[in-house]
From Swiss-Prot:
Signal peptide limits: none
Entry protein name: Putative nucleotidyltransferase MAB21L1
Family to which the UniProt record says this protein belongs: Belongs to the mab-21 family.
One Pfam family of this chain: Mab-21_C
Gene: mab21l1
Sequence positions that bind Mg(2+): E73, E75
PANTHER family: CELL FATE DETERMINING PROTEIN MAB21-RELATED, NUCLEOTIDYLTRANSFERASE MAB21L1-RELATED
Subunit structure: Monomer. Homodecamer; composed of 2 back to back homopentamers. The protein may exist as monomer in solution and oiligomerizes upon ligand binding.
Listed GO CC annotations: nucleus
Record organism: Danio rerio
Amino acid sequence: MIAAQAKLVYHLNKYYNEKCQSRKAAISKTIREVCKVVSDVLKEVEVQEPRFISSLNEMDNRFEGLEVISPTEFEVVLYLNQMGVFNFVDDGSLPGCAVLKLSDGRKRSMSLWVEFITASGYLSARKIRSRFQTLVAQAVDKCSYRDVVKMVADTSEVKLRIRDRYVVQITPAFKCTGIWPRSAAHWPLPHIPWPGPNRVAEVKAEGFNLLSKECYSLNGKQSSAESDAWVLQFAEAENRLLLGGCRKKCLSLLKTLRDRHLELPGQPLNNYHMKTLVSYECEKHPRESDWDENCLGDRLNGILLQLISCLQCRRCPHYFLPNLDLFQGKPHSALENAAKQTWRLAREILTNPKSLEKL
């Protein structure tokens, strides 16, 4: 048994050093190329409208606010200033969303975003995004990369297509630090010893973002309340949870396997599903020794089996907001197909670790 485990870990490490590292290097190169174009567009936006200041800064070889959705798809979060005159309200009526309401006694004129406040006193995510979209469209025509970049049509999101190869979504957002949403108040679960109190304090201090992007309720149509609402995002908090042991290596393996074998019709799976399942695996295996290098095969296998279970149940709860289903809106046939593909992949890796050389 131990020999089989060691064999699997050996082949996974080989796969990591060859396939995962080359994937990372290729994506880093793409990010540099994409960020040059996005920075140029945002510079033009800032000239037209100084309230939208580019926050796409490079720190320690990574760009703040940039998320990799897939090797050809990225999201850049543009942090806005001056949320202060608004109260953050998440009453659970819109899973995964919250609203920003003008604080009592505060005048609209005190806000930097006065014309985007609704009659009821809410700061409208949709109105801000609509204005931003107009500015980006104008900036694309003026910027020095105008020959290689164009807006993606037929969406209220702000998306750029670069060199006909890459898609970048630019999402206006507010950074919320020092508060924690009520809809995530159950976390951490009291009966689970992971993460420890120090890590919990770090994660909560990291806070979350409020993104201006489309959020749909179960019927798939956006109500006016939803279009004014902001989407909760915990990217930095989630990254902090995955520090230590082989957690990040495990996620890197899953992302690479997804890119190579689970990029399927209907796009049922993305990197964020993988990240979410690694967090759940950490709860199931709370001891640091469970994440030693020699447990890499067991952890990867456990996550793939959990993924199959989620696909078969057609439900993948968000880690911090379990009422939010990350498979919502995905075609059932696409989820079934993904379950079959994941099962084939898991069986192949477990029964014949050497097959990783060809995967």
